[in-house]
Amino acid sequence: MMNMQNMMKQAQKLQKQMEQKQADLAAMTFVGKSAQDLVTATFTGDKKMVSIDFKEAVVDPDDMETLSDMTTQAINDALAQIDEATKKTMGAFAGKLPF
C-alpha cells in the first residue's frame, strides 16, 4: 500500500512540474520567418498568434500568391519551432512517469 502512495505522490509532483513547464512554454515567444525575412509571424508557445508583419517589398497587389506563400512559410516556421521546443521541454517527462 505504501508503494502506491509513493507512486501517487511522485505522479502529483510530476504533474506540477509538467504544468509549470507548459506555463513557461506558453510564455515564450517564437518568431517564424519566410525567405529573406519578408514576412514574420510571431506566436506564443501555446500557439496563439501575436502578430504577422510584412516588409513593404513583399506587398504587391499584382502578386498576392507570393505574399500568401511567404505568410504560410513564416507561420509554419514558427509552429515548427514551437513543436520542437515542446518536444524538448515536455519529452523529458516521458521517462519519469511512475507507471
UniProtKB/Swiss-Prot annotation:
Organism superkingdom: Bacteria
InterPro entries: YbaB-like_sf, YbaB/EbfC
Compartments where found: Cytoplasm, Nucleoid
Coiled-coil segments: none
Gene Ontology CC entries for this record: bacterial nucleoid; cytosol
Spans through the membrane: none
Pfam families: YbaB_DNA_bd
Gene Ontology molecular function: any one: DNA binding
Keyword Endoplasmic reticulum annotated: no
Keyword Transmembrane helix attached: no
Entry keywords, A to Z: Cytoplasm, DNA-binding
Family matches, as Gene3D superfamilies: Nucleoid-associated protein YbaB-like domain
Functional description taken from the UniProt entry: Binds to DNA and alters its conformation. May be involved in regulation of gene expression, nucleoid organization and DNA protection.
Subunit structure: Homodimer.
Similarity comment: Belongs to the YbaB/EbfC family.
Name assigned to this protein: Nucleoid-associated protein SUB1611
Source organism: Streptococcus uberis (strain ATCC BAA-854 / 0140J)
